[in-house]
UniProtKB/Swiss-Prot annotation:
Residues 23-36 have a biased composition (Low complexity). Its main location: membrane. Residues 44-58 have a biased composition (Basic and acidic residues). The chain crosses the membrane at residues 105-125, 177-197, 210-230, 268-288, 315-335, 345-365, 415-435, 478-498, 505-525, 585-605, 668-688, 700-720, 731-751, 784-804. GO terms for biological process: protein transport. It comes from Diaporthe leptostromiformis. NCBIfam families: OPT_sfam (TIGR00728). GO terms for cellular component: membrane. Belongs to the oligopeptide OPT transporter family. This is Oligopeptide transporter phomP2'. InterPro entries: Oligpept_transpt, OPT. It is found in: Membrane. Residues 629-649 have a biased composition (Gly residues).
Amino acid sequence: MEADPKVPFTDEMNIQDEHNWESGSWSSSRRSNDSNVTLLSRRSSVEQHEDERQKDSDTLFEHGDAALDAQGIADPRLKDYPIPLVAQTVHLRNDDSEPILTFRVWLLSTFWVLAGCSISTVYYFKPFSVRLSGYVVQLCTWKMGQLLASALPTRPFTVLGRRWTLNPGRWSAKEHALVVIAYWGSSYTAYGLGPLSAMELFYGKRLSSPWAITFLVTTQLTGYGLVGLYRHILVRPPSMYYPGILPTVSLFNAMHGDPRQTASSLRVFMAIASAAFVYQWLPSFVFPLLSSLPLLCWVGRGSWEAFVLGSGSLGFGLMDFSLDWNYVAFLSPLFTPLWANANRFVGAALAVWITYPVAYFSDALGSLRFPPMSSETFDTSGGLYNVSRIMTPSLELNQTALELYSTPRWSFSYAMHFFWGFASASAIVTYAVLFHGRTILKALANVWSLDGNTADDIDSEKDPYVKLTSHHARVPQAWYALLLAVCLCLGTIQLYAGDMQLPWWGLQLVVAISALFTLPCGMLFATANVQIGMDYVSEVLAGALFPGRPVAVLTATVYGRQVLEQCLNLASDLKLGFYMKIPEWELLVAQVYGTLLGPFVNWAVMRLIIDTQGAAALLGREGGDGKGQGLGLGQGGGGGGGGGGGGGQQQRAAGAHTTEWNALKTKNFFSSSVIWGVMGPARVFGGGDGSPSSSSPYRWLLPSGFAVGAAAVLLLWLIHKARPAWRVQQWPLHPAIIFHGASLFPVFPTTNLTSSMAAAVASMGVMRRWHPRWFARWNYLLGAGLDCGAQLVQMVLGLAFLVFNRHGQQMVRMPHWWGNDAVAVDQCFPPPDLPSVIMSPM
């Protein structure tokens, strides 16, 4: 990471501005520029600024790392900043003459949203996922912006009385950041596309385009309205710093700083990204054995117990290591705080390496009938659950068939996945109430009294970054409230116009509960880079409220999940804009634009695929009956910047199997609607009237999960009250994160765990503590480069599979050899006495 340490933090602030910053008084006339008019009138000031910057650079270029103190902080004004990671990364420079919402921003953001949404939607209906990496977009946009700055005409023109220019000058960091933020708004396929495709392909319910797009837009934008309510808690305080965006800030610094100071940073980043790109071909395609090195399985070869304990793909992954960055990056080890990853690791290790093996070998809940680490849904005989056997031709529940067949069964590990999920949900709310309740209530009580243009927020009065941008016009609370109200009104109208089976009060209730969870989840995400979502709660809640209405369950689940996630996405992007000194109005416009444009592309591409390919091609020979489909809840690769656990596995699977159309995600949504909507939580977790689930083995999961989560936090709080001198709040211990870490498996392969935690200790532990200068200069660039190179390989492989592996052909396929064994790619061969059920698909 490099935050331009050799440049003084006054090189882009004139002396009067620095004096005003010190005194805390800013002229009300200093407003952020919102058009290119200001830019045209400031040509001379920009040129003068460049001259001053050049003189400062000439003076300081010789000093190198001498500008960094022992903690890697360059500016003495930030030496006491409460978050050293931010002080090391985010500079105190701001140039209000830099262009912001320019023609180049609109052009490039439109291009990347169209390209990214089209690619992600096409692969939504493929057996593996591919999306444009955020780092790839950031890198390409940098050069494209520079090209436009040199090619577009600079002649001004007048439109509706306002002077404009296509080219206001050099490509600025603020423009660059806005393009990336707009792309982030739609970088993933809209979550609501799954229910829409499931409704059409399985339930024969096709929505008209206007109402379908309304559904996608409202599910994506409703959460943005909550940001106005929570931004004074989730964005403004310095303690809410969002660790996941610091690598992006570091890369922006390297791209837009003085070339003589950042040239070395860019060279290092490009070298790392290139090396990662070359190396990643080995574990992803040529030598996949590198992805999983199951030492215990190799040592105990021939023993089925050693196979179960040591396999990282089918078993518990004990002593399994990985040299695949897609797996190593699972915990985002180079920028997630070490204490947070330690909590996740403890929870995962206690679950995967202690609880699950003991329960499995003791046959708890009939574990030996099912694979040890599987997220599929089974029947009582151990076969994959066939939902078509319990459905009538009209896709309603056949109670008699259910009693004759089976209620759903899970592996012990997947049953505990729900237990840990319920525990983490209750723990995070309880923690926020007990430890931060007064602060939250005070902030919420004053939220409407805080003017949109003031910086007097909680814990931010003395924040130098706040003071630096306090003159920027901020979005009033009323605008966020208006956005929320419009989305709720349109969403309610769409429910009835589209016959979504969800009553108006159901939408309001789901949004209200999601809003309740958003604040504690957001506080954790902003400080620990750990996001606990509404997946578990929204599905169970919707199934309990609307039994027998699968479409209503799908609709409520989407709103419950997306309101929370989109609120946190915008809060994170607002913090990025805050670090990049982008006014809130401009950032909100860019974010909403990208998010609005995405659903139109998602729906258009989905319509093209369904209309041209047909349901039979998308659903395979099963013809849409959902036979053999498991829940698939919570599965998926990680995002840019360090998720991606399992990405290499997905690509290798794609290389070994057909890449024809296969709506796996849609099938998973259909199966979820059957389990939680048609059958309902009462039958799954017990207590259903007259159903065989009255003796369900999982009847204890929900109540005990919520109770354990709340009890763990309550115990911690009681210790805090009984022994104040112990400073419990400063302990690196968070029950919600521990439970969340345990819930990650078996959804993700256990291969991820050991190597990812080792990388976290090396980066955020050893290097940050013992080599802070190196950490401050290179750590985030290292992480960004590794992510960029590895993700680019996955994108290239995915596109190659799409283009060449069609119509049953396997033109892109690595020949089998010792490092790419046809039976066991990790050389963890199943012994002859291995129970056949263990080899069932995960």
